[in-house]
Amino acid sequence: MLFHAKLALRSVCDITPELLGKLGVRGLLLDIDNTLTTHDNPTPAPGVEGWVAGMQAAGISLCLGSNNHPPRVEPFARRLGLDFVCEGKKPLTKGYREAVQKMGLSRKEVAAVGDQIFTDVLGANLFRVPCIFVFPMEMEKTKFFKFKRRMEVPFLPRKIYEGPEVAKSGRQGVDSI
């Protein structure tokens, strides 16, 4: 079960405060690349800034968690007005622990959100917090990522959660790799 998420959605923007309430979640640790924007893009994807504002208005704590370096993470976090952890070394639990502390919550109140099985999902499960898997916004072009995405196929969620408390963003995402 280390490689399986609690649930899967097409987009981070499909996550609602109602869904998080149902899960008992008060804070989210958010991956950046291919979760909130395309890989290495300094601008949030359409709808993400409004989604962040809506989550914050509902009292949901948000913290960015990335394996990337400060020059990538800091400006992106600043634009969204969010706290962050960079060089998190996912799937190791150090970054998750630091993010939970920054949010001032217990791990029982936090979920992780990301698009990669071997970093985001595995790391969340090792830290023992639920993971909401979102399909990547686009396919990466490097050979390493193409290889990694192929290795993820057996563990990809087979069903997208579409309960009544899920926003329907309309974004398709990459449903098959």
Whereabouts are the PLM-identified features?
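Asp-based, Mg2+/Mn2+-dependent phosphohydrolase catalytic module
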Residues: L2-L30, N41-P42, P46-I60, G65-A112, ...
